[in-house]
């Protein structure tokens, strides 16, 4: 069973305003509404079982006002539907180029870190060389690693290798990458464009 899952959904965004990037995204790959994202992931979970205690990293769009089918709140709702509790946001700071928005240049992209665990327990991340992902009482699993990724932007929507190193340093496998486009050693990639790139 997979203990760490990365999901980079092809969010459907509205045109114009904060969601102007939608037209750009839809020219690269088919996009999905929140309902379609939940349905697709649920189907994959039935084929690739996820452990009862596991970590989830879900990429989202940096917006609270972009509509019900996009943005941070929509992604948090997807986490809830899948049985994961959102814990924190992990920013990817793009060190080479930003994206223009009505509110200024955007140099970040957000990933939600969420967990699934037994009632009354939490799941700690790797720290101090400890590779356990076992349940520990709430508040006992402290992690001293940084909470952001600093890396260059590459092809449209392609996430940096630094992110996957970050995940592997905090969470243990088996690893599942949904809506994957990159073949990566030690990971199971699933998606229509899986294998498009190599790590």
Residue ranges of predicted features:
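Class I S-adenosyl-L-methionine-dependent methyltransferase catalytic core
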Residues: 1-199
